[in-house]
């Protein structure tokens, strides 16, 4: 897969099914799924690297979206609507795990363990937009944690909440309406 080739170009070597480097650690910034072929292999590779300490990873909007797609609302339905558009976005991921519900559930559970951001010495890593207000609100709500958590997940599934806005901003970025219905 392309990711393995990129890791090799960067000097990582595969040992025991996990890519490692002698002097550095890769940081993955999410969107392991819903982009291109071999999504299951990408998830397995990133997971093995993070669990062995050879890498760090954060959640992207694609991981969040698939978590919400499979998380039931307390009042029925799912946190992410099961529309044709949303199903289509996840179809390749669904297809790759179609015969193995256990591995699929394990992948979703692993996505839930990914931090929303990393605030490391001298560098901050976030999928889309480091907005201090959103980060601070989440930290306060989560008692200092940068993990999604069930309460934040459910609250962020409601577009009328500040949690929705905060999670949407850090995972997708700010959206600004352009004049004259412009786009880029």
Model-derived regions, located:
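Short, intrinsically disordered, charge-balanced linker/junction segments flanking boundaries
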Residues: 1, 178-184
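Active-site neighborhood of divalent metal-dependent phosphoester bond hydrolases
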Residues: 36-43, 48-178
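N-terminal active-site segment of His-dependent metallophosphoesterases
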Residues: 1-45
């Amino acid at each position: 897969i392309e990711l393995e080739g990129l890791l090799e170009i960067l000097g990582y070597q595969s040992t025991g099914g996990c890519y490692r480097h002698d002097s550095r650690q890769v940081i993955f910034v999410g969107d392991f799924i819903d982009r291109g072929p071999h999504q299951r292999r990408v998830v397995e590779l990133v997971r093995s690297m993070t669990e062995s300490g050879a890498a760090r990873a954060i959640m992207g909007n694609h991981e969040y979206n698939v978590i919400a797609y499979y998380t039931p609302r307390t009042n029925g339905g799912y946190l992410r609507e099961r529309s044709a558009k949303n199903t289509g976005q996840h179809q390749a991921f669904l297809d790759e795990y179609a015969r193995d519900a256990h591995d699929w559930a394990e992948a979703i559970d692993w996505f839930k363990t990914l931090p929303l951001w990393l605030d490391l010495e001298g560098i901050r890593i976030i999928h889309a937009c480091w907005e201090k207000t959103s980060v601070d609100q989440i930290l306060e709500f989560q008692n200092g944690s940068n993990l999604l958590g069930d309460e934040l997940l459910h609250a962020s599934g409601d577009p009328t909440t500040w949690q929705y806005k905060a999670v949407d901003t850090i995972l997708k970025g700010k959206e600004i309406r352009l004049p004259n219905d412009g786009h880029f």
